[in-house]
Each structure stands twice: as C-alpha cells, then as structure tokens.
Amino acid sequence: MGVIRLTEADWRLFAALRLRALADSSGTDDAEYRTEMSFTGTQWRRRLRVHAQFALADEERLVGLIAAHRASPGSVYLYSLWTDPMARGRGVARTLLTAAIDWGRELGAHTVTLRVHRNNAAALGVYQDLGFVATANPADGSQNTGPADELTMSLTLS
C-alpha cells in the first residue's frame, strides 16, 4: 500500500474518490454529495491546491482518503478521513493519518487536531493509538468543543 499526495493533475481521480466516500458515508441523496457531484474541474483542482489530500492505493485501487490543511503556522487540521468498506481493518486509516501527520511535521506544525463522532469506536481507537487525546473545552471543562455528537482530539508533535 502506498500513500499518494494528490495534485491538481489528479483532480479526476480525487473527484471520483471523494464522491465514492460521500456516497458511502452519507448516501447519494445527501446535500453535500449532490453539491460536490456538480463541481467543475476548476473547483476540484482548487480543493487540491488549497488543502492537502492524501489517498492510499492498494493494488492499483484507491482505498482511502484524508484531507489536511494548515489551520495556523503551528497547527494542522485533519478532516474527511474515509476508508473503503472492503479495506477497513487493514491499517488504511492509520497509514493515511501517519502521512498527514508527517506532512504537518514537515510544515513545522506542533499540533494536529481533528474531530470524530463520539460513537465511532474504531476511529477513536486508531486516534488514541497514534497519541491523540480529547481536547477539553476551557470554558466548561467538557470534552466537547464541536457539535454535541463530535469530540475534538489533538496530537502534540515533538
């Protein structure tokens, strides 16, 4: 398995993979899927230019995707992690996360953050194994800094 940093030249591949991820996660009736289904090549290329997109290839088939962007000079935010249902449980998420974290290190980031659904035990386990910890809301000490069903987690890079 190999991680690929997608570039603007890969926009067709990215579009197909992203739409596959949305269809699997939310269904084709979802508003986000319908919106992105109508994206032009220019819109897909812009996404690849503005945020880092990493895909994982397994025997010539893309089986996972993660997005990352520099939230501030010292911070990277990861989002939209997806693995193909047929590839789950084979280390795809961990491999993609590691690539995105390494990208953050190369940028000089000292913190990586992400959000995860509170009931996604598989994802929580992977994040915790990689060293991510729940981020407390400084105002009330709760573990919720986003929507009620999501948990914000962070990883401190050395």
Positions of PLM-derived features:
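C-terminal "cap" of GNAT-fold acetyltransferases
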Residues: 110-113, 117-124, 129-158
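Hydrophobic alpha-helical segments
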Residues: 21, 72, 94, 127-131, ...
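Conserved acetyl-CoA-binding loop-helix of GNAT-fold acetyltransferases
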Residues: 83, 89-102, 106, 124-129
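Extreme N-terminal starter segment of soluble prokaryotic enzymes
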Residues: 1-3
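Acetyl-CoA-dependent GNAT
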Residues: 5-86, 97-99, 103, 135-138, ...
